[in-house]
Amino acid sequence: MNFLLTWIHWGLAALLYFHNAKVLQAAPAHGDGDRQQSEVIPFMTVYERSVCRPIETMVDIFQEYPDEVEYILKPPCVALMRCGGCCNDEALECVPTELYNVTMEIMKLKPYQSQHIHPMSFQQHSKCECRPKKETRIIQENHCEPCSERRKHLYKQDPLTCKCSCKFTDSRCKSKQLELNERTCRCEKPRR
């Protein structure tokens, strides 16, 4: 049975390889069939290709379906339109603004048990924009002084009011037969 799966795996790989080889022979390099390899690509062409936009991207199926580990998936990755490219500011990132789902047939193999073609849904991006990076927004919003320089790990802070409170709760301390000291935010032995 393992021998048969190996032959199926290699047969599919060969089929994909020869199909891609035919496509690459038929397609002009970089979209411009009349360009020579030593020719310099003009700035505007380079710039237009680099802007934030939906680009065909190879995506690992396990990245989209991490719980499918009991199967061998063929192919293991799929071509999807995803946002890619550059923004003109380091504080910006290329993100999707419009999404849609596409369903593809994927072969699911369960070693020594079964194999079947199964429809799987994937998210594609149809429009992209440059928007502020999440880390940048968090840094701009965080205007509060830290609760404690030495023991930051003991406190949590409300980002809107800057109010500090203990991460540990009184009930958590009591479950360990301790009491919460609200001044130090530590669980301590009860005083007698």
UniProtKB/Swiss-Prot annotation:
One annotated GO molecular function: heparin binding
Subcellular location, record wording: Secreted
SS bond partners: 52-94, 83-128, 87-130
Keyword GTP-binding: no
Residues glycosylated per entry: 101
Annotated signal sequence range: 1-26
Tissues of expression: Expressed by the venom gland, and probably other tissues.
Keywords: Angiogenesis, Developmental protein, Differentiation, Disulfide bond, Glycoprotein, Growth factor, Heparin-binding, Mitogen, Secreted, Signal
InterPro entries: Cystine-knot_cytokine (IPR029034), PD_growth_factor_CS (IPR023581), PDGF/VEGF_dom (IPR000072), PDGF/VEGF_growth_factor (IPR050507), VEGF_C (IPR027928), VEGF_C_sf (IPR036841)
Main location class: secreted
CC per GO annotation: extracellular space; membrane
GO terms under biological process: cell differentiation; induction of positive chemotaxis; positive regulation of angiogenesis; positive regulation of cell division; positive regulation of endothelial cell proliferation; positive regulation of focal adhesion assembly; positive regulation of mast cell chemotaxis; positive regulation of peptidyl-tyrosine phosphorylation
Functional note: Growth factor active in angiogenesis, vasculogenesis and endothelial cell growth. Induces endothelial cell proliferation, promotes cell migration, inhibits apoptosis and induces permeabilization of blood vessels.
Family of this protein: Belongs to the PDGF/VEGF growth factor family.
Quaternary structure (record): Homodimer; disulfide-linked. Also found as heterodimer with PGF. Interacts with FLT1/VEGFR1 and KDR/VEGFR2 receptors, heparan sulfate and heparin.
Entry protein name: Vascular endothelial growth factor A
Organism: Agkistrodon piscivorus piscivorus
